[in-house]
Amino acid sequence: MVAAVTVGLLLTACGSGPLPSNLAAKEGHQVEHASSASPSASESLPQTPLRAGEHFVELKTPADYRPTPKAGSTDDYRCFLLDPGLTEPELVSGVNIIPGNPNIVHHVIVSQVPASQVARAQALDAADAGDGWTCFGGTGIGGVGGRNLDKSDWVGAWAPGGGERVMSEDVGIPLEAGTQVVVQMHFNTLTGGGADTSLVRLRLSPAAGSAKKALNTMLLPAPVELPCRLGHTESPLCDRAAAIDDVKTRFGETVATADLLHVLCGGDPIGDTQQCTRSVREPMVIRAAAGHMHLLGRSITIDVDKGTPQAKRILDVPVYDFDDQGSRALS
């Protein structure tokens, strides 16, 4: 049995009424996953010029971090705490994440850490040898998605096919003074090796006096526990409990994510197709949607009000391409 997670995400702004203008996307297929190209973090894609009141803050992960998967694994999930030096509240209006070594970078998630939780993050860093700390499934600071799944602590994310995301001028992600960020890197050394230094470029503007609506990321995880293939059912990891224990051994997971997903989503824990239905508890406008799976993924959809006259499919990926995971702006 292979235990994994499928994640859909929505960029949402609270409020009702007509759908505002989309996030302005500046996305391109930056580098194919596991390709032979290895651009440095300084080799950015062309960026959208700064708009009135905006400025850039650039953050880099520790220089030349070399992933060190545990024996029997090719995955290293590592979190790094970085300080953007915010002395006043700011709004994030764009994110550009540039992997330094895309041969080994599977995905990147940037999460905010409010000032009240920075000491917790620093303690996790200090308790783990070397740069950063092991963080499978989340940062380890505030649970999966930080605050909660409906309004997560995500600031931005990158997976193969993603690029710079510049938001519509009427929205922004709030960051309070003293906020720091955690950059979670998922490294996979199956088809490559070497070191990595990645870059996160935040597009910021002052929050004071701004009329922008707060933008949040809603996480839509679903369980993916694939049955072992015919002819391979004798593996010890075809036992669900053994597979989950293996994940905890390799990545130090302290939260039973797999079991929590089944409480959230219900259904048979093992199957080729999985789904999860979530309730929306307040008015919101969906600005963009994205789906993330691993290489065994075949298709992914996100439906709103399924089975009702108002039903609408907001994400439809009939043939999933691991190298094309950029978010889709909605109209």
Question: What are these model-predicted stretches?
Answer:
Residues 1-7:
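Sec-dependent N-terminal signal peptides
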Residues 10-13:
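C-terminal motif of bacterial Sec signal peptides marking the signal peptidase cleavage site
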Residues 15-18:
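Bacterial signal peptide processing site
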Residues 27-331:
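Beta-strand-centric surfaces of beta-sandwich/beta-rich domains
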